Each structure stands twice: as structure tokens, then as C-alpha cells.
């Protein structure tokens, strides 16, 4: 009888261990999931960084996703050209060729009914003719100074590629997808796996109206990647045309790094759009954002100054920041940085659980 009890106990013990193992595996699976929060003010390049993460995992887009992106490419091209030509009167500009007024009229008619799978060739022709007008190109080059809204930094790329994009069999290539301008509204979650570790990345709408929706929801994230656009030091907000965009980005960064929700959270700062900044700093003085700056007006010194300004915003002297200068559209550069950042996050957060 005692022997039978002993065998029963053994069986019970084995079952108990099996259940414990299963529970532990479920817990381990959750622990192995790294949660990242992508933050930054509007137009900073968050969506592009998220696309780069997807490229890092070699995750292919579905046919349905590509079709959606193609439609968005068409829409962006037409709408952004419409914004450009409508800004001409306020800028005191006229077309080089009066015939372009006809193209504007036809484009306006097309916009009223844009339910097309592909670009209509005549619509593409009108956009192409407008883009070839020197005055339109001049207006595009000066769009930031004139505060013309909703014109992306990569719009020129799509205008230049109109002959390819307007073809009946057009499918967005990797560059199209990466440079495609998309606005994040609300919270977008993307999941993927790198180095046998599952990631959940949350991209949050950057405009002021979006920010109150999320801050209390993400206290358990493993790290925050905060993105600030270097090139915005002489620009103002879309929502408030008196507020400098760099200063607004710094205010948001300050509120995040000093938030009680993220007191112990790693923060990685991407100073993005370095390529645009490098060109702009040659012509536009950084004093527009930082009148106290006394250094040389060159890339190295101004970026170093901006870094110190961001780092000084933290009230926690023990908090470590990882700062990278990035060009989110430069796949090779960003992929190397993301690989380094992801490795750091894995080691920093999962090593604590004894898994690595």
C-alpha cells in the first residue's frame, strides 16, 4: 500500500512539475517579449523608423498592404501638388507658362473623384507638367520657410518618379515604401521577432491632440525610442504657428523622461534628419531656436550643443541616455543603429530575468 502511495505521489509530482513548467514557459514567453515605445513630435520620422525595423526582420509586405500603399502614393502625389499650387498666390508667384492653369483645373477635377486603383495617366501628366515648371520647384524648395503645410520631405522623390509610378502595373518598391509619408493617428502596434526575441513596438501619434491618449498605458515598456528632427530648428508647429518645432520636441522629451511612468525606463534618443540639418545649417542660423548658442555655425558643434540641451532636460542624474544621429531614410545606417539598439535592449532588460 505504501509502495502504491509512493508511485501515486510520483505521478502526481510529475504532473505538478509539468504544469509548473507550462506556466513558467508562458511567463518566460511574456518576459521574452520586449516592448518598445516610439515617441516624438509630429513629422519627426517615427513611421520611417518603424518601417526600417520591419526591413530589419525581412518581413515582406502582403499584396493587400502593397495595394494600400500604392493608393496612398497616388493620393499623396496629387494632394501635395494641390497644396503647392494653392500656396502660389500667397507667395506672390505665378507659373512660368500660363498653360499650367489648365493643369491645375484638371487636377482639381481629378481630386474630387480619386476612387481609382491606379493613377489615371492624364492626371499623372498634369502633375508632371506642373512639377516641371521652375516656379513650382522654387516653391517646393522654399516650402518650410513659407510654412506650406502637409508637404513631405520626400515629395520630390515621388514627383521625379511619376513616369514609373503612373504605370498600370505599378507596385511600390522598397524605397517607395520607406519614403512614403504616412500620418500616425492613435496607437499603431507592430510585432516581429529578432534574435529569437519577440518585439512589440508601439508608434504613437505625435501631434498634441494625440498625446493624452497613451502616456499612462505604457509604464511597462522596456525602452523608449524618442525621435527628434534636427532639421526642425527653424520651423513652427502645424497646430500652433508661433511655437518652434525643436523647442516643442524638447518639451515633449522633458515630459517623457521625467514622467513617473518612465522613471526606470531606458531612453534612446534619435536625432533624426541629420542629412537635412547638415544642409540647412549652412544657410539658416541655429539662433532661431537657441539664441544663447555661441559656438561655430557648423554641423559638429551645433549637433553637440543640441545633444547637451536634450540631456540637460532630465531631472534624474543617474538616468542613462543613448543618443544617435540618424537619417531614417538611410537604410544601411539606420539598420546598423537599430541592430545595436536592439542588442542593447535585449541585454539590458532580459538579462535581469536570467534568460540571457
UniProtKB/Swiss-Prot annotation:
Molecular function per GO: G protein-coupled receptor binding; G-protein beta/gamma-subunit complex binding; GTP binding; GTPase activity; metal ion binding
Span list, region G4 motif? 268-275
Lipid attachment (N-myristoyl glycine) is at 2
In residue numbers, the region (G3 motif) covers 199-208
Arranged from A to Z, the UniProt key words for this protein are: GTP-binding, Hydrolase, Lipoprotein, Magnesium, Metal-binding, Myristate, Nucleotide-binding, Palmitate, Transducer
Q: Where is this region: G2 motif?
A: 176-184
Domain named G-alpha: residues: 32-356
Q: Does the keyword Lipoprotein apply?
A: yes
Give me the ranges of the annotated region G1 motif. 35-48
S-S bridge residues: none
Q: Where is the lipid attached (S-palmitoyl cysteine)?
A: 4
Question: Where is it found, in Gene Ontology cellular component terms?
Answer: axon; cytoplasm; heterotrimeric G-protein complex; neuronal cell body; non-motile cilium
Q: State where Mg(2+) binds.
A: 47, 184
Which positions are annotated as binding GTP?
43, 45-48, 153, 178, 184, 206, 272-273, 275, 328
State the needed cofactors, names only. Answer: Mg(2+)
One GO biological process this protein is involved in is: adenylate cyclase-modulating G protein-coupled receptor signaling pathway
Query: Which portions of the sequence form the region G5 motif?
Result: 326-331
The residue range of the signal peptide is none
The record describes the protein's role as:
Guanine nucleotide-binding proteins (G proteins) are involved as modulators or transducers in various transmembrane signaling systems. Involved in behavioral responses to P.aeruginosa by controlling the expression of daf-7, a member of the TGF-beta family, in ASJ sensory neurons.
- What protein family is recorded? Belongs to the G-alpha family. G(q) subfamily.
Tell me the subunit arrangement.
Answer: G proteins are composed of 3 units; alpha, beta and gamma. The alpha chain contains the guanine nucleotide binding site.
Name of the protein in its database record: Guanine nucleotide-binding protein alpha-2 subunit
Give the source species: Caenorhabditis elegans
Taxonomic lineage per UniProt? Eukaryota, Metazoa, Ecdysozoa, Nematoda, Chromadorea
Amino acid at each position: 500500500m505504501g509502495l502504491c502511495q509512493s508511485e501515486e505521489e510520483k505521478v502526481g509530482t510529475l504532473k505538478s512539475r509539468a504544469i509548473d513548467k507550462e506556466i513558467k514557459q508562458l511567463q518566460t514567453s511574456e518576459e521574452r517579449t520586449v516592448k518598445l515605445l516610439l515617441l516624438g513630435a509630429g513629422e519627426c520620422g517615427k513611421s520611417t523608423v518603424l518601417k526600417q525595423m520591419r526591413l530589419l526582420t525581412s518581413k515582406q509586405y502582403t499584396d493587400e498592404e502593397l495595394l494600400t500603399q500604392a493608393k496612398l502614393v497616388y493620393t499623396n502625389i496629387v494632394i501635395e501638388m494641390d497644396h503647392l499650387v494653392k500656396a502660389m498666390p500667397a507667395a506672390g508667384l505665378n507659373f512660368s507658362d500660363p498653360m499650367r492653369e489648365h493643369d491645375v483645373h484638371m487636377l482639381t477635377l481629378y481630386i474630387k473623384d480619386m476612387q481609382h486603383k491606379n493613377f489615371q495617366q492624364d492626371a499623372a501628366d498634369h502633375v508632371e507638367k506642373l512639377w516641371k515648371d521652375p516656379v513650382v520647384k522654387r516653391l517646393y524648395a522654399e516650402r518650410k520657410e513659407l510654412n506650406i503645410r502637409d508637404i513631405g520631405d520626400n515629395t520630390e522623390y515621388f514627383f521625379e518618379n511619376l513616369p514609373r509610378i503612373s504605370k498600370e502595373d505599378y507596385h511600390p518598391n522598397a524605397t517607395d515604401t520607406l519614403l512614403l509619408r504616412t500620418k500616425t493617428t492613435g496607437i499603431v502596434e507592430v510585432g516581429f521577432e529578432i534574435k529569437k526575441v519577440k518585439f512589440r513596438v508601439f508608434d504613437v501619434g505625435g501631434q498634441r491632440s494625440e498625446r493624452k491618449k497613451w502616456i499612462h498605458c505604457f509604464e511597462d515598456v522596456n525602452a523608449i525610442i524618442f525621435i527628434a528632427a534636427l532639421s526642425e530648428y527653424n520651423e513652427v508647429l502645424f497646430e500652433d504657428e508661433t511655437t518652434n518645432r525643436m523647442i516643442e520636441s524638447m518639451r515633449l522629451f522633458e515630459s517623457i523622461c521625467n514622467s513617473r511612468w518612465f522613471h526606470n525606463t531606458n531612453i534612446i534618443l534619435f536625432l533624426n534628419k541629420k542629412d537635412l540639418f547638415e544642409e540647412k545649417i549652412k544657410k539658416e542660423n541655429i539662433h532661431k531656436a537657441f539664441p544663447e548658442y555661441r559656438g561655430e555655425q557648423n554641423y559638429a558643434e551645433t549637433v553637440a550643443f543640441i545633444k547637451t540641451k536634450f540631456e540637460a532636460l532630465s531631472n534624474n542624474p543617474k538616468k542613462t541616455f543613448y543618443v544617435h544621429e540618424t537619417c531614417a531614410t538611410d537604410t544601411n545606417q539606420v539598420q546598423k543603429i537599430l541592430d545595436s539598439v536592439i542588442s542593447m535592449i535585449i541585454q539590458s532588460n532580459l538579462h535581469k530575468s536570467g534568460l540571457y
